[in-house]
Amino acid sequence: MNTLNARYGHTNLVARDWRSLAAFYEQHFGCVPVPPERDYRGPDLEAGTGVPGAALQGAHLRLPGHGPNGPTLEIYQYQPPLEGLPPVVNRPGFGHIAFVVDDVPSAREAVLAAGGRPVGEIVTLTTATGSKVTWVYVTDPEGNVIELQSWSK
C-alpha cells in the first residue's frame, strides 16, 4: 500500500568537497550530472534545515541503470560544516550505497586507487533463492560506505 503516493527521488551525501566527490561518482560509477548546479542560502534554507547561517552548494547525479528520469545521488557541501564520525556499516541511519559491478575485485582496486579505503574483505554468499552474490564494502574518498556487488546463479 502506498497511501502517500510516494516514489523514490534521491539519496543525499553531505561532502567536504562536493566537486571532487561528484567527480569520483561520475568517473567510477557512471553517474551523470543533472543541471543546474545547486547554490542555496538564506532564511528559507536556514528554516528548512534548522541550521543557522546554512549555505550549500552541490549537484544531483543521475544513478546508472535507471534511465533519464531515474533517481539521483544528491551531493551537497554545507557551510558551516559539521565533522562526522568514522564510517561503519552498522550505525543507525544511512548505511551505504550499493553499485552492481561486473568484477568486484577490479572495482575495489579502482575505488582504492581513487582514494577510497577498504572496510571489509571480498566475500561470496549464497542467498535463500540459491543465487550467489560477491560483495565488499569500501569507502569513497570522503569516508561514505559503498557496497560493490556482483550476482550469479
Spans of model-derived segments:
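Core segments of cupin and vicinal oxygen chelate
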Residues: 14-69, 106, 113, 129-131
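Short, structured motif recognition centered on aromatic/hydrophobic residues
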Residues: 70-73, 94
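Amide-forming acyltransferase catalytic core, primarily the GNAT-like/NAT-type
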Residues: 60, 80-81
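Generic beta-structure capping elements
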Residues: 64, 76-78, 151
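Vicinal oxygen chelate
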Residues: 1-4, 13, 35-36, 73, ...
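Eukaryotic phosphotyrosine signaling hubs
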Residues: 8-10, 92-96
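A short, acidic/glycine-rich surface segment
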Residues: 42-47, 81-86, 125-127
